[in-house]
Amino acid sequence: MSKTPSNPALSQRSDMVVFLNGEYIPADQARVGIATHALSYGTGCFEGIRAYYNSERDQLYVFRALEHFQRLKRSCKIMNIDLPYTPEELVEQLVELLRRNDFHENCYIRPFAYKSDEIIGVKLNDLTDHYTMFAMPMGDYISTAGLRCLVSSWRRVDDNMIPARAKISGAYVNSAFAKSEALMNGCDEAIMLTAEGHVSEGSAENIFLVVGNEMITPPPSENILQGITRDTVMELARRELEMLTRERVIDRTELYTADEIFLTGTGAQIAPVVEVDHRSIGTGVVGKVGGSLMSLYGDIVRGRREEYMHWLTPVFDKKPAASNGSNGHVASNGLNGSNGAKTKRGKQTTEA
């Protein structure tokens, strides 16, 4: 079993600042009641966003921030949650949060919109909606040295049960069952099938197979999250490797005969798979395509490829430009009622 990095925790620093209901407050003052609807029923939706530190430029770059918040808005629409900010405003809030925490290391951001009433009863309508966001240092979420995977006995929930195109908090118990099964059986990660027995995705990652000179991946109709890293990899494969990606139904046994397999996700980044169900994939080591994409991705997210800078939002630039269409304005004196000044904190200069 390959070594899996330890899980990050918000408590790694005592001076963390979070965003809650329009204000930036100390993390230890952010409280949610024990009867909160979302805590009992999973009635919330979230995003996972990464920011990468470039020590040469002393700059922190948020990767594809606008696209993440556009997806969050879509998730909120499905969940009947009123999120009263535009995606561009949400990017501004994120940048301000990172500035206030003065991160000089790779980090992970978790925006979360949820049903906040403290009541008993299963419904989505006529409830109060709240929004929060926090950030924490984060290196590798799962190993990138080569994963051993298990095809899970737990099937991916269907769109007419809990829609996978929305990042719904309650839906992730499905992933937790699958991931725990894999870990308890000596593997690193789970691969989940649909109810029909087709390949869907990992516990929290999209999946790609390399077969000959093409990549294949399950289509959205196979109950996958339409991942932003997935979209990134498809574009990079086309532009940089001259490889097309075909979206199609994939049978379980195709996993065993693939030349390469890798998982993609904001947390996972690009994680090669070297074994599935005790069968070596390809030569049993990280493959050429996966390795090339990992290297390319690592440079892009740290601002080392100028042609992809439109995907990045710099945090410490005085005039940062949010990715793909944001007006780039960031309020330095707080947003939505907060007037707290930024506190300078000690730098940590680690790169994953």
List the predicted regions and their residue ranges.
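Short, acidic/charged, Gly/Pro-enriched secondary-structure junctions
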Residues: 90-108, 112-119
